[in-house]
């Protein structure tokens, strides 16, 4: 059977396969090219891909086309070309190596990619195309686009789909058909659209490569908003290229050079476009030095392309400042960068900032033994001996002990802290991704804490677990939200991240967003169904926290989500209590007007929002609460009214407000104190004056039958004593028979004693017992007696 197949197909070194050799058929892709199945070879014990013809019944012409594609791929055996093994006889299909990551098109649409990976993909694609063009005769791909650039498990490029590939100079009039062109038309050069009979040449692929660069830079599809193929063709012929949106921070400096290369590659004149041999030299430099000055690659071509540009760049999104920050001073669009390159404007670029903390902070133990794990150089070109040596060395060094060692751990930590994504891409191994550091944190925790967004992207691409916790119970999401790292938050939420995970204080990520007033992160979390009712160890929901920290924007966001503002926290505190306590007037107004909210709601100890505002002296909050019908005479469990609280804490303006709004000035606490007693006892002169002006009873007796004068004298508040003293009060005794003078002398308050003596306080036997002391009060008493 196999011999018959070989003769029939004339495959040369390729082999034929029977359907029985494969198991577990799973469709992984379909389109105009047919269907692609993931299969497992029964004997080889490995996964392969089979691209089957779109037709149910394959005729001789389709068989020949499939055979031709297989032969081209066989001829083009190379590191960045997808390996082909042969032909499956039934169903008829091309048997190839299975690429776990899938196509570049799929990857670009899935999540933001690290810049180092983007540069590497561009470079490896260029190296693969250079190999094809260096064949004799040159092999033209003619359908280079992200859908035909596959990526292995380590995100290395494998160029595929040689169905349209031809040798240099060949042409057929039927090559440009309208069937299946929608995904390809944007990658066709203008000369091919204008002249169907034009001979193919290498510059066709160079133009397509430019559009691939555009897609890698923007992670968008070219002309995505244009639904009419003819309109796209007309635009391209007229010199228009895909629109150039802003490239937001962070971005390496080499981005400008890559844009210049892209501009030359999509030039309207094919002769101006560089060859892939020239391109690979430039992309290799970009990969090696993405954050350093790179030679000017954007020299002015003979004729400028007509480009659609935008004059304004998007404002930079609020995000955590990265420790390694190589971006330009200002955000600018691709078109703005191009205009700067075209006009020859030199840009002064700041160097990357360095992270303040050093890798030594991680306290990694020294390694007694270890192995150097295998890695793949990201910049080795097809003809670079340096790249080959690097690869050879790392592979040989990979044999050794199993598992990551301390020295490998230190390399990973150093790469992440320094923001060296290129280094991280080379040394990170699958078994290292969820490595636990000495602080019980993962590499992902470290990257988030250091603000290294590019490293976070690479770790997530390698399936780092976003739900691991450190010693404090924090996940990377907790840390990212706490540090307001919006970009990192978006990356984490794009994964299967637990949005309601709690740290050691029972805080969720939404608690941190509420505390920081981070509306962007709050919205992102709510879109991922973050719970608004999770409570921390003090019973606070995110709404409580937002009110406590005065984050009105978060309060409004949560209210729009229907959050229950009547949900009680610890000790029955409502969000309104927290807002009143902290004096956040706009939030108090907002909450007090919500349906079902009572401005007289009491905490476990009986305090209302008005009590709390009075205690902290938040006059404007107290006024709005009173305007909203808060009871000025409501009592706490200790029978304190808001006036008692204001007097005790000395907030005179608030006390005046309460008095003018009907607060009872003679109300007694559970211990028998009036507002005047509390103001005098605590030495609040202005409040005492206010209460006296408001006709508060200075003769009123409190605990131990003491007047306000007794209380002020006992505490040594001489100025208050001066205000309260009168002939009727000065020698009054409490239930222990002590006058104000006795109490002042007992407390050794000499200035108060002097004040009372000055006003004629009587010295009796009870007072004389203090004369034996050495205090200044005793001295005053002795002098007065004599």
Swiss-Prot record:
The residue ranges of the Protein kinase domain are: 22-286
Residue ranges of the region described as Disordered: 293-328, 347-378
* Class of this enzyme: transferase
Any one Gene Ontology molecular-function term assigned to this protein's record:
ATP binding
Gene disruption phenotype: Conditional skin knockouts in embryos show significantly thicker skin and aberrant skin stratification with Krt14 expression extending into the suprabasal layers throughout the epidermis. Adults show a similarly thickened epidermis, with expansion of the spinous layer and basal cells independent of proliferation rate. 60% of adults develop spontaneous facial tumors when aged.
Q: Which SMART domains match?
A: ANK, S_TKc
Q: Note the site residues: Cleavage.
A: 342-343, 380-381
Q: In which tissues is it expressed?
A: Expressed in the epidermis of the skin (at protein level). Ubiquitously expressed, with an abundant expression in the thymus, bone marrow, pro-B, pre-B and immature B cells and a weak expression in the spleen.
Annotated GO CC locations: cytoplasm; cytosol; intracellular membrane-bounded organelle; plasma membrane
Q: Which GO terms describe its biological process?
A: morphogenesis of an epithelium; skin development
User: Which catalysed reactions does the entry list for this protein?
Assistant: L-seryl-[protein] + ATP = O-phospho-L-seryl-[protein] + ADP + H(+); L-threonyl-[protein] + ATP = O-phospho-L-threonyl-[protein] + ADP + H(+)
Tell me the active site: 143 (proton acceptor)
Task: Look up keyword Kinase and say if it applies.
Answer: yes
* Top-rank lineage group of the source organism: Eukaryota
Q: Where is the composition biased (Basic and acidic residues)?
A: 295-319
Instruction: Summarize what the UniProt record says about post-translational modification.
Output: May be phosphorylated by MAP3K2 and MAP3K3. Proteolytically cleaved by during Fas-induced apoptosis. Cleavage at Asp-342 and Asp-380.
Q: How does it sit in the membrane?
A: Peripheral membrane protein
| The UniProt record lists the keyword Iron-sulfur | no
This entry's Enzyme Commission designation comes to: 2.7.11.1
**Cell location:** Cytoplasm; Membrane
Q: Which family does it belong to?
A: Belongs to the protein kinase superfamily. TKL Ser/Thr protein kinase family.
Q: Quaternary structure? A: Interacts with PRKCB. Interacts with TRAF1, TRAF2, TRAF3 and TRAF5. Interacts with BIRC2/c-IAP1, BIRC3/c-IAP2 and XIAP/BIRC4.
Give additional notes from the record. May act as a tumor suppressor in the epidermis when exposed to dermal carcinogenic agents.
| Biological role | Serine/threonine protein kinase. Required for embryonic skin development and correct skin homeostasis in adults, via phosphorylation of PKP1 and subsequent promotion of keratinocyte differentiation and cell adhesion. It is a direct transcriptional target of TP63. Plays a role in NF-kappa-B activation.
What is the protein name for this chain?
Receptor-interacting serine/threonine-protein kinase 4
């Amino acid at each position: 059977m196999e011999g018959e197949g070989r003769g029939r197909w004339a495959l040369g070194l390729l082999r034929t396969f029977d359907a029985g050799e494969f198991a577990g058929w799973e469709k992984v892709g379909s389109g105009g090219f047919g269907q692609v199945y993931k299969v497992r070879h029964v004997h080889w014990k490995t996964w392969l891909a089979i691209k089957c013809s779109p037709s149910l019944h394959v005729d001789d012409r389709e068989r020949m086309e499939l055979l031709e594609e297989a032969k081209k791929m066989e001829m083009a055996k190379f590191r960045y070309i997808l390996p082909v093994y042969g032909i499956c006889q039934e169903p008829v299909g091309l048997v190839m190596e299975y690429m776990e990551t899938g196509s570049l098109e799929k990857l670009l649409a899935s999540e933001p990619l690290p810049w180092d990976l983007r540069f590497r993909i561009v470079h490896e694609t260029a190296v693969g195309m250079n190999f094809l063009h260096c064949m004799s005769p040159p092999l033209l791909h003619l359908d280079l686009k992200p859908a035909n650039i596959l990526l292995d498990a380590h995100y290395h490029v494998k160029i595929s789909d040689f169905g349209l590939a031809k040798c240099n100079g060949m042409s057929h009039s039927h090559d440009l058909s309208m069937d299946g062109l929608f995904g390809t038309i944007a990658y066709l050069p203008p000369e091919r659209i204008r002249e169907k009979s034009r001979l193919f040449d290498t510059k066709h692929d160079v133009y397509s490569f430019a559009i691939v660069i555009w897609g890698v830079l923007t992670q968008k599809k070219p002309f995505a908003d244009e639904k009419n193929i003819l309109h796209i063709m007309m635009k391209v012929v007229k010199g228009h290229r895909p629109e150039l949106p802003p490239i937001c921070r962070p971005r390496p400096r080499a981005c400008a050079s890559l844009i210049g290369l892209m501009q030359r590659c999509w030039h309207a004149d094919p002769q101006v476009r560089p060859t892939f041999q020239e391109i690979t030299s430039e992309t290799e430099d970009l990969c090696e030095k993405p954050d350093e000055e790179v030679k000017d690659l954007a020299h002015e071509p003979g004729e400028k392309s007509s480009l659609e540009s935008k004059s304004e760049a998007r404002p930079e999104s609020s995000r955590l400042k990265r420790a390694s920050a190589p971006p330009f001073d200002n955000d600018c669009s691709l078109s703005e960068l191009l205009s700067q390159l075209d006009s020859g404007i030199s840009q002064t670029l700041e160097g990357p900032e360095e992270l303040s903390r050093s890798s030594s902070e991680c306290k990694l133990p020294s390694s007694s033994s270890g192995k150097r794990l295998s890695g793949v150089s990201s910049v080795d070109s097809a003809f670079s001996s340096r790249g080959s040596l690097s690869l050879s060395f790392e592979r040989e060094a990979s044999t050794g002990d199993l598992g990551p060692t301390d020295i490998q751990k230190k390399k990973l930590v150093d790469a992440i802290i320094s923001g060296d994504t290129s280094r991280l891409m080379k040394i990170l191994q699958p078994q290292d991704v969820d490595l636990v550091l000495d602080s019980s944190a993962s590499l992902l925790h470290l990257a988030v804490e250091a603000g290294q967004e590019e490293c976070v992207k690479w770790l997530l691409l390698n399936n780092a677990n976003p739900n691991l916790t450190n010693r404090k119970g924090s996940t990377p999401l907790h840390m990212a939200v706490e540090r307001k790292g919006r970009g990192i938050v978006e990356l984490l939420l794009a994964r299967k991240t637990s949005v309601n995970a709690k740290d050691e204080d029972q805080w969720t990520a939404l608690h941190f967003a509420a505390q920081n007033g981070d509306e962007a992160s709050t919205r992102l979390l709510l879109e991922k169904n973050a719970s608004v009712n999770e409570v921390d160890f003090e019973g606070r929901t995110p709404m409580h926290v937002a009110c406590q920290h005065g984050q009105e924007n978060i309060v409004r966001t949560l209210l729009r989500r229907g959050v229950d503002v009547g949900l009680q926290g610890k000790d029955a505190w409502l969000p309104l209590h927290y807002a009143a306590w902290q004096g956040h007037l706009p939030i108090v107004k907002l909450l007090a007007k919500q349906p079902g909210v009572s401005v007289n709601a009491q905490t476990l100890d009986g305090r209302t929002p008005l009590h709390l505002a009075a205690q902290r002296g938040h006059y404007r909050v107290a006024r709005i609460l009173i305007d909203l019908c808060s009871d000025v005479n409501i009592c706490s469990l200790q029978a304190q009214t808001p006036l008692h609280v204001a007097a005790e804490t000395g907030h005179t303006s608030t006390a005046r407000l309460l008095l003018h709004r009907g607060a009872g000035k003679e109300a007694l606490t559970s211990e028998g104190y009036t507002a005047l007693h509390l103001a005098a006892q605590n030495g609040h002169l202005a409040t005492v004056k206010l209460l006296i002006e408001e006709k508060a009873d200075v003769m009123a007796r409190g605990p131990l039958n003491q007047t306000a004068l007794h209380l002020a004298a006992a505490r040594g508040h001489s100025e208050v004593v001066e205000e309260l003293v009168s002939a009727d009060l000065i020698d009054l005794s409490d239930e222990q028979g002590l006058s104000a003078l006795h109490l002042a002398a007992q407390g050794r308050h000499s200035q108060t004693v002097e004040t009372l003596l000055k006003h004629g306080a009587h010295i009796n036997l009870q007072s004389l017992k203090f004369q034996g002391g050495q205090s200044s009060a005793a001295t005053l008493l002795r002098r007065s007696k004599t």
